[in-house]
Curated annotation (Swiss-Prot):
It comes from the Bacteria. The lineage of its organism: Bacteria, Pseudomonadati, Pseudomonadota, Gammaproteobacteria, Alteromonadales. Bacitracin is thought to be involved in the inhibition of peptidoglycan synthesis by sequestering undecaprenyl diphosphate, thereby reducing the pool of lipid carrier available. Catalyzes the dephosphorylation of undecaprenyl diphosphate (UPP). Confers resistance to bacitracin. Belongs to the UppP family. This is Undecaprenyl-diphosphatase 2. It catalyses: di-trans,octa-cis-undecaprenyl diphosphate + H2O = di-trans,octa-cis-undecaprenyl phosphate + phosphate + H(+). PANTHER family: UNDECAPRENYL-DIPHOSPHATASE. Its EC number is 3.6.1.27. The chain crosses the membrane at residues 1-21, 38-58, 70-90, 97-117, 134-154, 175-195, 208-228, 236-256.
Length: 256
């Protein structure tokens, strides 16, 4: 992994991890276009820049890490359980789906879902306008919705946001619960991969790792802030359109 590729992947991870456009899908495509081989070391690099994105959430929502918000974190933990169980049981099946055609199709499917959701969504009818108001029942349904993110190209953020909106959360609360839910999900996935591949890195890899980590953290930190501001004035329609267009481009490249 050279410095240039580390910066590019760090930027992509930072932008896409918490937006409903599938960070995994973008990383897979970018790696192929950059000619980065799917070696264990390069896959472990992906884990490192993902950890940076996790820290960006911690930095943005440090006020939520207090005893008075314990109830919120219990709900986050409950929402994590469905994905954790399914990912553990079907990990080999999931890995077999990591290819451009699957990513392209799921980009389109996710885009259509967002367009259909926004067509009938009325924010003034939402029962939950703050992330701390999420109920246990809502947390369970959001967790079930997040399971679909195991299909590459679906987007963890996208599936959890859709689930949250369908459960009565407004757009901002949906996005923020998705951010917080990303902490145990990404920490579990990253921790597991690091335990498997920690011995693969050499001293020569440290510079690229550091550059990718810092890049991902900075970009993710500001992406989260800008995304929340965006949702105060706009809908997810633009993300739905982007997903469909990007998915069509991927399938065209894959089959033409």
């Amino acid at each position: 992994m050279d410095i240039f590729n580390a910066i590019i992947l760090g930027i992509i991870e930072g932008i896409t991890e918490f937006l409903p456009i599938s960070s995994t899908g973008h990383i897979i495509v970018a790696a192929q276009w950059l000619g980065i081989e799917a070696t264990a070391t390069n896959q472990a690099f992906g884990v490192i820049i993902q950890l940076a994105a996790i820290l960006a959430v911690l930095a943005n929502y440090k006020d939520k890490f207090t005893p008075k918000h314990l109830n919120l974190w219990i709900k986050v933990a409950i929402a994590f359980i469905p994905l954790g169980i399914i990912a553990f049981i079907f990990s080999d099946v999931i890995k077999a789906l990591f290819n451009v055609p699957v990513v392209g199709v799921m980009f389109i499917v996710g885009g259509v879902i967002f367009l259909l959701l926004e067509r009938n969504y009325k924010e003034q009818n939402c029962t939950t306008t703050d992330v701390t108001q999420v109920t246990y029942k809502q947390a369970i349904w959001i967790g079930i919705a997040q399971v679909f993110a195991l299909i590459p190209g679906t987007s963890r953020a996208g599936s959890s946001i859709v689930g949250a909106m369908l459960c009565g959360l407004n757009r901002k609360a949906s996005a923020e619960f998705s951010f917080l839910l990303g902490l145990p999900v990404l920490a579990a996935a990253s921790g597991y991969d690091l335990l498997k591949h920690y011995d693969l890195f050499t001293f020569d890899d440290l510079t690229a790792l550091a550059v990718g980590f810092v890049t991902s953290f900075i970009v993710a930190y500001f992406t989260i802030k800008l995304f929340i501001r965006f949702l105060e004035n706009f809908t997810f329609v633009s993300f739905g359109i982007y997903r469909i267009v990007f998915g069509v481009i991927l399938l065209t490249i894959a089959y033409v």
